[in-house]
UniProtKB/Swiss-Prot annotation:
Stretches assigned to the OBG-type G domain: 160-333
Organism, as annotated: Shewanella sp. (strain W3-18-1)
Protein name, UniProt field: GTPase Obg
Essential cofactor(s): Mg(2+)
Alphabetical GO biological process terms: ribosome biogenesis
Length: 388
């Protein structure tokens, strides 16, 4: 199936059902009190993460999604049925963004997690709600409010512990093949990798981590050169980045300039992503003698003014890959568990929340002030007198 990691859809929550104006009419009760019921709430639209999905391709062909409308209220104090909620299944790792405001509504990072993206309309109130000791035959009702409508941008971000960065042909795909069972395409031309790949690495029995390989970056990627930087978003959830550097580029380019270009593109895309822990990994060390290799590594590290971890590997010959995988496993295990709890202060305020609350408060205030605990509909029925 084709890998699609972005889609724009339109979601519409159901409108609330309107309240009903009705009066009790029975035999011998021709002028009964009000009995108009409330309408039903409109259905809301939710996104739900499902581990059985791995692409957003379905949303490319079906862009409009609408929840059910709430039913109107009816007589005899019958409340209308609430509209059925609409639940859209998306892959784990999906991020929902309001396309108009660019507001991030939330991230779905665990199987079964649900996210409200469009809130259903509030039900209208029937005339029963407006009866009081001074208003015996209210003809007021309220209409249901419209459901929320959103233009929604869905982004699929891969969930991985380790992300690979580097120029095209640096050996990223070869490395992921060496340490996992993933089989991305490998060839001797640039941009062999066109979509992200995931691999599960098992350095020790019962212990593993996930590694992500994305298409290579080149200088000017932020302006759209090459495949651009659209795939960098898949590294946002990684806990550590491996910067793969070709120690002996076949085209004669300077590894120092290539490394600086990658860091520059990373900072242009996201300073937060650029600040993630990053290790330098020199690949294709089998092309140099050991003395020459050591000298070249020291020179590059010095010119880059690099003070972090440095590793040398040959992904093709699988030299140093096992040791690097073990180091990564120990590092990831030493990190505190990720906190995916949503901060209440960061919760999205939906467009109709204030309206709903104000409407309720207004009705409740009137209702509480005027309502008589001893009020009885029968007190205001027509008195029937039988004469002989």
């Amino acid at each position: 199936m084709k890998f699609v990691d972005e889609a724009v859809i339109r979601v519409e929550a159901g409108d609330g059902g309107s309240g009903c104006v009705s009066f009790r009419r029975e035999k011998y009760v021709p002028d009964g009190g009000p009995d108009g019921g409330d309408g039903g709430d409109g259905g809301s639209v939710y996104l739900q993460a499902d581990e059985n999905f791995n692409t957003l391709i379905e949303f490319r062909f079906e862009r409009f999604h609408m929840a059910e409308r709430g039913e109107n209220g009816r007589g005899r104090d019958c409340t209308g049925h609430s509209g059925k909620d609409l639940i859209l299944k998306v892959p784990v790792g999906t991020r929902a963004i309001d396309h108009d405001t660019e507001e991030v509504l939330g991230d779905l990072t665990t199987h079964g997690q649900k996210l409200l993206v469009a809130k259903g309309g509030f039900h209208g109130l029937g005339n029963t709600r407006f009866k009081s000791s001074t208003n015996r035959a209210p003809r007021q009702k309220t209409l249901g409010t419209p459901g929320e409508v959103r233009s929604l941008k869905l982004e699929l971000l891969l969930l991985a512990d380790v992300g690979l960065l580097g120029m095209p042909n640096a050996g990223k795909s070869t490395f992921i093949r060496a340490v996992s069972r993933a089989t991305p395409k490998v060839a001797d031309y640039p941009f062999t990798t066109l979509v992200p790949n995931l691999g599960v690495v098992n350095p020790r029995p019962g212990q593993s981590f996930v590694i992500a390989d994305i298409p290579g970056l080149i200088e000017g990627a932020a302006e759209g050169a090459g495949l651009g930087i659209r795939f960098l978003k898949h590294l946002e959830r990684c806990r550590i980045l491996l910067h793969i550097i070709d120690i002996e580029p076949i085209d004669g380019t300077d590894p120092v300039e290539s490394a600086r270009a990658i860091v520059g593109e990373l900072e242009k895309y996201s300073p937060k992503l650029a600040s993630k822990p990053r290790w330098l990994v020199f690949n294709k060390t089998d092309l140099l003698l050991e003395e020459e290799l050591q000298e070249k590594v020291e020179r590059i590290v010095k010119e880059l003014e690099w003070e972090g971890d440095v590793y040398t590997i040959s992904a093709y010959n699988r030299e140093g890959t096992k040791e690097l995988a073990l180091k990564l496993l120990d590092y990831i295990a030493s990190l505190p568990p990720e906190d995916n709890v949503v901060n209440p202060d960061d919760e999205v305020e939906f467009k109709w929340d204030n309206y709903h609350q104000a409407n309720l408060d207004s009705v409740n205030e009137d209702y509480d002030d005027d309502f008589d605990d001893d009020f009885d509909d029968d007190d205001y029925d027509v008195e029937v007198i039988y004469q002989r």
